[in-house]
Amino acid sequence: MNLSPIQEEIVNTSGNLIVRASAGTGKTHTMVSKISKEINENRTHKVVAAITFTIKAAQEIKDRLSVDVTRHFIGTNNSFVIEEIIKPFMKDVYGSDYDLDMSTDYSKEAKVDTFQAAIEKIKTEGILCSYTDNKKNFIFELAQEIVEKSVACRLFLKAKYFKIYIDEYQDCDKSMHKLFMYLCDTLKIETFVVGDEKQSIYIWRGAYPEAFVSIWHKENFTTKFMGDNFRSCKQIQNYSNLLYEETRSLYSPIKELNNIVWLSTTTTAWSSEVLKYIDPNKKSALLRFSNDNARLGAGELSLNGVNYTYIPQTPIAEITTDTAWLYSAIAKCLIIEKYSAYDLISEIPVEGNETRKLVSAIKRMLKKIEQSIDDEDGFYSATNALATYLGYATKGEHLKKLFETITDEKYHVAFEPEKYQHIAITFHSSKGLEFEQVIVFAEDYRLSDVSSLCNHYVAVTRAKSKLVIVKLSNYNANCFQANLAKIFAKSGVSINDVLIQR
């Protein structure tokens, strides 16, 4: 895949750089190209850190990179500060009582109210936990404390890293932002930031999109804007660009308005009406705010002749300990035909070492887990044996969730959603995905606050060639219509200039 002129500029720009990347602009491809180039050009012993929010996103970056990344850090925000700052240097600041094995547990049962209580939990239980208030971030507060007070930590980071790349920066909270800017401004580690405040769908859990905007105005950062949406057709681009001030200038009127369908309909007729505009031979997705509405919507659409598969949240998705990746990998081994022991090893958070002995042992243990599927206790024992072999701890309640995920076939679709032509899913789960056709409900987005606007932007920009907006007669849907009209009016445009209401 070739680079566009703006992508070339980004790849070739040195120094601190912030990129505002609208939906569908090839952000990951650009970042991976930049990382590859800068690793290849590096002539020092130093390495890079590529940091993102999920293990899945980190794995995608690893898979796309054509260079050897064995020495480099590619992982999640939390794993970066835990492995590179907290575990090795906490004892420097807090004393030898904290020179111990630590694991994470962000579950509800492990949460605490104060910084001191969280520190005490590490000392007594060896557990890195989180706050009851999900808008506060203990892990990054602790990392900040350590890096500011430990000379050895600062020297280590400066000596090890020549560049840090941070993905999805709009989802960073205040504590993350403070630490990343400390690494950049105080430790002088070159920093690449990419994000888009229009796509901040995690404000409810502490995401602080203003952090991204503040970097945009920093004098020590070069700024670049990626606005060319290679995913969506022109009409859908126009619609999404009008939602935000920064992209309104990209709006350009067109004559053909057949790619967006606005359906004013009823709760009983909506599914049959929608299917008049959906091509059953092209992939489509119903995106809803709640899992319940996605499930019910899939049922109604299926009853009207097009089979929609509801993609549920699996029981193991709720697990937040540092063993979570392993439960997911075991489930994939037993559910996905082509997922192997090698794939599991590649997902080990610390770089997997594919020795023949390791692969053989993991294959043997996975076989034992598979053979125990009809014996719940045997399944728990076999899974625990693999976890212990890899240095991870299990919990009884989590083993139960894994067993349920694997034995209840309704959850299997969640591991291979791309296999299905038509799916129903929450728009939070759709981030990073794309579909030829997308169905959304007006009532899910009142457009009266930043969060609602971001959610709507993310949902509509999943669509390539067709967007169906279902407008029922209720308060939230009416708010959506009124607020959308106000937003479009800022550009001197009416809703009817952008789409046809049916």
Protein language model features and the residues they cover:
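The feature marks helicase ATPase cores and/or their adjacent C-terminal helical subdomains
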Residues: 1-502
